[in-house]
Amino acid sequence: MPRAEFAEYDAASPAPRNGCTEDTRKAILDTLRMWASDNTATKVYWLNGMAGTGKTTIAYSFSEILNDNESLGGTFFASHLRVDTSDVRCIIPTICLQLAARKYFPSLLHLILDAVEDNPDCKSWRIGKQFQNFIVKPLTAAYRDTSKIVFPVIVLDALDECSDQSLVAELLSVIFKHSTSLPVKFFITSRPEIRLKESFAKPWTHSNFILHEVEKEIVKADIELYIKGWLNMHNSSNDWPPQAEVERLVNMSGTLFIYAATVCKYIAEKGTPSMSQRLSDVVNSKLEATSGVTHPLNILYERILDAAYASTNERERKNIDTILTAVVYAYNPLSISAIGDLMEIPIRHIEAALSSLHSLIYIPSLGPDMPISSFHASFYDFISNKIHSSKYYLDPCISHKHIAHQCLGLMNRVWSEKAKISYLEERKCTEISESLAYACSNWTIHFTYKDVGEPASAKHVATCGNLWLT
């Protein structure tokens, strides 16, 4: 049965997740506590908000609260950073196994395993059939055998990051259809995309909270606590950070927590000669939230990239472009080593390029063999949109074609009898490098992205065929 192992809220995801800073978001978390403990409340709660308003952070903290109260049914934190965590077909299998493992309903695990054994072709099922066989039937039967009073809560975060929004709409439809008769609740977060808003069009079926409509003064107070906490953590001087500059930074953040988080990372970036100077530079710039919800974030991203590209030569600029292409458009996060192999850039050049991008890209401290990724989905939105990113725009079609050719080039370079591998997921070949495994698994996906065009020359296919078909 397909499932996403990195979808649980506390999993070691490519970009680490965290809960809310202490004493922030108290109102919404208190509201969610009351909803979770009230069996007469609606079975579905939708937290929606624009990009960067803190939905995932709230969902993480709420999951922690539920777990501490022994009322967490399961979590699926969707993310575009991995194929499985963006696949809607993985949500129900992942959730039902978590719910069964928590043993709120003693007979549930046995019932689900029986359902899987009886239906080996379940991977190809439609969402409605999955939900009926792995949630509705076993959960209804298991509930008869328990005295559970408080309904466990299933947390589904960032559904807007799933790759097929038509399947998300299908999932929401079956949740609404069956939720009133099930002994579980559903907490769902997403951006207010049009298709998702249509799914939540009937207000009597759910509770909802619009995060970007919270009173601005409440959000500003929370953002101020966050900024002070972060900057104090990196500099504990008595007069740091200056209150006037904190207030200016709070005003610049508007209601965007991701703006405050990105600015703080930028100010405290490793190797920064002067945090005070960076703070002063930021607050004296023109990055206010003057128009549009994400407008200030786009300007901030542009400012950080301006600094990263400053004083670079042509080769260094090309390296940054290529690295960002791999980080933003790879279907799974790659390590620095794998990016070096795949995109043909020495590791020392990658590390040099990334040194000024720590506020945009998560780079683990454990070394070059750990995957790196963008901190937030809004950076993908920025870099892939020509209107938003202007001179830093990385065309998706050109980028996918570039990666596809690099995949084939790598396969061609390392081809040998020893390097033959199976394309089948079941075969574990530890001698195959991360970059080669990625290339063999994903070159066709990159080539089939929208208008990329013909997959490759006959010569490439003939040369590389043995690697990915053997």
Where are the predicted features?
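Alpha-helical repeat solenoid scaffolds
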Residues: 321, 380, 437-444
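Long, hydrophobic, amphipathic alpha-helical segments used as structural scaffolds
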Residues: 103, 415, 451-454
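Amphipathic helix-loop-helix modules that constitute alpha-helical solenoid scaffolds
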Residues: 411, 415, 431-438
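Short, well-ordered secondary-structure microsegments
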Residues: 440, 444-470
